[in-house]
Amino acid sequence: MSASQSYPSINALSGPLVERLVADAPTLRLSVSQAAGGARMVDAGAQARGSIEAGRRIAEICLGGLGTVTIAPSGPIASWPYSVTVHSADPVLACLGSQYAGWSLADETGDSGFFALGSGPGRAVAAVEDLYQELGFRDSATKTALVLEAAGGPPESVVAKVAEASGLKPEDLTFIYAPTQSLAGSTQVVARVLEVALHKAHTVGFDLHAIVDGIGSAPLSPPHPDFIKAMGRTNDAIIYGGRVQLFVDADDADAKQLAEQLPSTTSSDHGAPFAEIFARVNGDFYKIDGALFSPAEAIVTSVRSGATYRGGRLEPTLVDASFA
C-alpha cells in the first residue's frame, strides 16, 4: 500500500460522519464541549448516557468511513440474537490504517494519570506507529478525530501531543470518548471483530495486500458497570462469539493456513471467560497469550479458486457465562 497510489483519504471520508455525530448529539444522548485549548470533546458515555446507535456510528468513524456497521437480529449466538456486523471493501486500510487502537496516549507532564489508546482517522494523520511504514500510507487533513476508550477526555498535554504529531492546531481536533462500561463504548469495541482478524493476519505474516474484502459479526454484549466485567464481555463477544470471513487473492494452501491460524482456539488461554483469565494473570495484559485476541471462527475464501476454508468454533456456553 503506497501513499502515492490512489487510496482514499480516510479523514475526508470520516469527516462528515464526525460532523453528523456532533449534529445529532441531543438524540444520541451525547455531550459536546470545547476544551480550554480549543479541542472539541464528545462525551459518548462517561458523564453522558450515550446510546447503542452512537456506538455504531463511532465504529464507522473508527473505520475511517471505509466500512459499514449494522446491528440486526439473527446473530451467531442464539441466546444473544442481536449482533454487530462489520463489512469493509478495504479492510486493511479501514481496520489497520484507522480502526486499530494503536496510538498510546498518556499524560506524561501532569498528574492526571490519563492513559488511552487512540483509534480512528487521526492515527493516519500523525502516523507515529511503525505500522504505517509497513502499510506505506499516511493521510493528510485539515481536521481530524480520535476515538478513545476512556472515562474522560484527554488533558491538555495529550491534546498538545496529538496536535504536534498531526501538524494541526488543537481547535482542529475532535476527541470522541466512551468507557467500556457504556452503551456506546461496548458497542464500538464489539465492532472490532473484523479488525482483530486483520491484526492477527498481520501478526502471523500473511500478505496484507492479498486481503481484498472482509466481513465479521459478534453478539452485542450487554454493558456492565464494573470495568473488568464490561471489558470481559466485549472481549468474549469476539473471542467466543465472533465470526469473520475474509476474501483473499491467494492460493488454496495460503488460504487454508490462514483459516487455521486466525481463530482464538490457537491460544493457550482459550477456554475461560476473559475476566477469569484477566484475574488469573493479576491484571497484567502482557501475560495473556496474544493469540487469544481473535475471532472465535474464521472463514477464508480464495477468490482465485473459489475454495473456502474454516477454522475455530463458536463457544455459546462461554458467551452465556460471560454475559449472564
From Swiss-Prot:
InterPro entries referenced in this protein's UniProt entry, alphabetically: METHMP_CycHdrlase
Listed EC numbers: 3.5.4.27
GO molecular function: methenyltetrahydromethanopterin cyclohydrolase activity
Protein's cellular compartments: Cytoplasm
GO CC terms in record: cytoplasm
Chemical reaction(s) catalysed: 5,10-methenyl-5,6,7,8-tetrahydromethanopterin + H2O = N(5)-formyl-5,6,7,8-tetrahydromethanopterin + H(+)
Protein origin, superkingdom: Bacteria
UniProtKB keywords: Cytoplasm, Hydrolase, One-carbon metabolism
Top-level class of the enzyme under EC nomenclature: hydrolase
Biological or metabolic pathway of the protein: One-carbon metabolism; formaldehyde degradation; formate from formaldehyde (H(4)MPT route): step 3/5
Family: Belongs to the MCH family.
Subunit structure: Homodimer.
Protein name: Methenyltetrahydromethanopterin cyclohydrolase
